[in-house]
């Protein structure tokens, strides 16, 4: 399912450890990561996953910006990452890749079961970045809902071969 914060890495790991396909909702993973870091990341789970991220400079930048030891004050607002657009800044691209990596890495940690990432075809701007992060964490399955994902197989093949990929965005309105 696409339950943001419900179909997360913990549930996906538990389902996968029971011999079924555990699925992480890929929607708003960047927001979930940054908010949980600002809540202090009790137990250090997210920081441990970021330490395994293959681009340490990106992980450091995320931690420097969003991690608050002990958590933010209850009345303090969250620092919210910018909304992703068709040309996101480098820092946001890194955050989306890392957040997808973290979710899949944690869902797969400590077992050999299958873990998938579920993305929505209609939310296209983070798709390439989320797929790349999930593939870095060795995601087993990619599921796509809310549309026909015609471009996704080629993108996955390109990333698997170590090549860059691109995706055309559907634009409506004026």
Regions found by a protein language model. Name each.
Residues 1-174:
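Active-site entrance/lid segments in N-terminal catalytic domains of soluble metabolic enzymes
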